[in-house]
């Protein structure tokens, strides 16, 4: 009997690595750019709040890329690191606070002829000798790495992407003083393919994760003035820091209420998308 009990304990211990879930995070925040033509924003100020929220939610494997460290090379390296570490059932939180920009699609695989891009530290606002498009981080590239993560973690794994940016807008807006917007309306005219072309069959995969965006594609994303922060980032920090469990519909309602309480001329609506949005609770990523 004792021998059988010992055997059961050993089997349970052996099974632990199979069913354990490790939490990983990549947090990118930009308030500075190599190209000074970009409007000044404060995405770097979001990082401490995001890290605090993640630590409270049990994340101890966090990669933070802020300002000068958030080059395209470093961001791709971080994605490769996460893919290399991913195991079935693992949990991944990806956060981007910074500018967004649309780029004339060099691969001709977008219906509207435009790629939506995150703006790393070394990306330029206009095409030039230093950046012909290869320093922008396209949605195809981001989706490629997220797809690789999903392949590794399987259906039991969790992937959440938070985008506190937008791909349109101007530097300032409104009659009640300046409002800082993340994103520019000017389309970048890429003169070359991106550094790492992504096969169309891979880049066009379905959104096999959950994405929370600060606004719709037709809206601008304005920062908070006091405290200085991204609207979506601060809303999530306030709503999810107490680790309450709630449906994604309830979370979206609370973010909308938070937005409505802001005195601003910029109207924006949070958006939750992805195949897993009705299968996994966002609040559970931080519990």
Where do the protein language model's features map onto the residues?
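N-terminal secretory signal peptides that target proteins for export/translocation
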Residues: 1-2
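Bacterial N-terminal signal peptides
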Residues: 5-17
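Caspase-like (clan CD) cysteine peptidase catalytic core
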Residues: 20-22, 74-97, 102-176, 246-254
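Short glycine-rich His-centered loop
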Residues: 22-38
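Active-site-proximal C-terminal subdomain of hydrolase catalytic domains
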Residues: 29, 47, 51, 139, ...
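Solvent-exposed loop/turn segments at secondary-structure junctions
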Residues: 31-35, 60, 68-72, 98-103, ...
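Second-shell loop/turn segments in exported
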Residues: 34-41, 63-69, 128-135, 220-226, ...
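Functional beta-strand-loop-alpha-helix junction segments that form "active/interaction loops"
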Residues: 44-90, 130-144, 258, 269-271, ...
